[in-house]
A protein has these predicted regions:
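Non-catalytic C-terminal accessory region of glycerolipid acyltransferases
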Residues: 4-8, 137-273
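Thr-Gly-centered strand-to-loop micro-motif
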Residues: 74, 111-112, 134, 157, ...
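A generic structural signal for well-ordered alpha-helical segments
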Residues: 63-64, 125, 146, 178
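A transmembrane-helix-recognition feature enriched in membrane-embedded lipid enzymes
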Residues: 3-72, 123-124
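Short gly/ser/thr-rich secondary-structure transition/capping motifs
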Residues: 66-74, 133-137, 197-200
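Catalytic core of membrane glycerolipid acyltransferases/transacylases, capturing the structured
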Residues: 31-54, 66, 81-135
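Glycine-rich helix-loop-beta junction characteristic of Rossmann-like nucleotide cofactor-binding loops
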Residues: 75-80
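Short glycine/serine/threonine/alanine-rich loop segments
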Residues: 69, 130, 183
């Protein structure tokens, strides 16, 4: 009897928090659409980033209060009043950026260009002057300019969600940006014990709850002189830090669908005992 009730609870909670996220994004998008042509660029950027932080903080609060997630994002707080830096996390889940953006009121984010036209995310991203990644030269130029104005740049070096253990190949753009902006790169390690919203996970598929999700800081690299050497060191740092991470269990299989089915079944059986 307990197992069916737990499954029903997990469906209700997962759908409820996704619905809340959609509502937050839609309401904020309407506000951002109105404000974008009215506010001066600098004011609009600050307002946009603060609004995104506040909205996603409400979402993260719902994850905690419903018991869906056990979140530990406190490590990012130490960067809040520091000098400009590139924050470079691994990327196991679709909501990684959303959760990181809750911790700092002035984070620029490099994101996929198609998200800039997304009905849920596009207007807010444009108001916050987030940086699309479809044109590498322009992306690098915009990222360097933003860092020179202060604040933090969130850039996932993999360029997409992690598909293999421990990490995908890294994109050299992070090294180029750090070199030209003359700012350090702070590695952030995301650890999670559930493949919820990983690459290949259907949006409305039930996760096994609660999910443990933790962010910790790794090495901070000085601005690189040689980008190739830096990228080699950066990949080594991620591999060392992610050795034995909880997500290794479900990243080690190349067949995502088979591995996700097996994981869900084993997790459900364990939670029902």
């Amino acid at each position: 009897m307990l197992r069916p009730l737990k499954i029903i609870h997990e469906y209700v909670v997962a759908y409820a928090v996704l619905t809340l996220l959609g509502m937050i994004c839609l309401v904020y998008s309407v506000w951002a659409l109105v404000m974008y042509p009215l506010l001066p660029r600098r004011v609009g950027t600050a307002a946009g980033r603060f609004g995104i932080m506040a909205g996603f903080r409400m979402f993260s609060w719902s994850l905690t209060m419903t018991g869906a997630y056990r979140l530990d994002l406190s490590a990012i707080d130490s960067l809040r009043d520091g000098p400009p830096v590139i924050l470079a996390p691994n990327h196991p889940s679709l909501i990684d950026a959303l959760l990181i953006l809750t911790r700092h009121p002035n984070i620029a984010c490099v994101m996929k260009a198609e998200l800039m036209d997304n009905v849920f995310l596009g207007a807010g991203s444009r108001l916050a002057r987030y940086i699309p990644s479809d044109q590498p030269r322009q992306m690098i130029k915009d990222a360097v300019a933003d860092l020179r104005e202060g604040g933090m740049l969130l850039l996932f070096p993999e360029g997409t969600r992690t598909k293999r253990d421990p990490i995908n190949s890294l994109k050299a753009s992070i090294g180029i940006i750090a070199k030209h902006a003359n700012v350090p790169v702070q590695v952030a390690i995301i650890e999670t014990d559930c493949p919820y919203l990983r690459k290949g996970w259907p949006l409305f598929r039930r996760p096994t709850l609660p999910i443990t999700y933790r962010v910790r800081l790794g090495r901070r690299f000085d601005p690189p002189g040689n980008v190739n050497s830096f990228m080699t060191e950066l990949e080594c740092e991620f591999r060392q830090q992610l050795e034995g991470a909880p997500q290794s269990e479900w990243l080690s299989s190349e067949d995502n669908s088979t591995q996700l089915d097996a994981y869900s079944e084993s997790s459900s059986q364990s939670s029902g005992r």
